[in-house]
Amino acid sequence: DDVNLKDKQDSTLLHASRLAAKIDILPFLEGKVSIANIQLFGTQAKLYQSSPEAKPNFQFILDTFSSNDTTSSPLNLHIGSILLRRVDVSWDRQWIPQKTDGTMDINHLHLNDIALTAHLRTLQEDSLNIALKRLSINESNGFTLKNMTFDLNVGKNSGELNNFKILLPNSSLDIPSIHSKWDNPSSNSNWKTWIQNVAMNGNMQMELLPSDLKSIYPNFRIADRPIMLTTHFMVID
């Protein structure tokens, strides 16, 4: 309880009222990292970059977990449950002036009351299986994400997204399923070449009240008529 983490300038990077994790020992002996649960409650994280030449104040944490050791074991991570409650995160690029029009500023973000519930079933070099059961965020300039959920399973040559839902105060987006397939990219291929070989199909239902996005697009402040869309889409390589 009451965990404090300082950055290299001796400023508070993170303060958590409660931080807990439970690690499964037996999988660790087999070269796997299996964490039963991670809990982070009542937390404030202050992230910043003081100048264009300076590194972000959290860079030293990323450097700690990075490695140039090519003989290390392949990535194999499982986290049974991730719980975040009452988490506030700020991000400031300190040399850039703040916007004054009351809209969201990506250089000076303040995210409040973040709540998250997720299950990372598998994370390997060639696969990802994650279930997001809850994500809610309030942004200081008025944007509110009431909830976001999805199930994502990605392998070497295919991916599947199920139960993708976004809920705003007066809007919703529902994608029951997206299925996609692709060829493994060659070592000399680029992103554009790879994306041209992706096949995809799915369904989408959307009801959007533009004023829900007024903190991003100010002209939407007076838009009070909902936009409704139901569609099936297919992309063939």
Segments from the language model and where they lie:
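Short sequence motifs at beta-strands and strand-loop junctions characteristic
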Residues: 142, 223-225
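Transmembrane beta-strands of outer-membrane beta-barrel proteins
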Residues: 162-165, 203
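Hydrophobic, lipid-facing positions within transmembrane beta-strands of outer-membrane proteins
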Residues: 114, 148, 227-229
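Repeated loop/turn-to-beta-strand initiation elements of outer-membrane beta-barrel proteins
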Residues: 158-161, 237
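Secondary-structure transition motifs
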Residues: 2-127, 143, 170-199, 205-216
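Short, intrinsically disordered, charge-balanced linker/junction segments flanking boundaries
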Residues: 13, 28, 222, 230-237
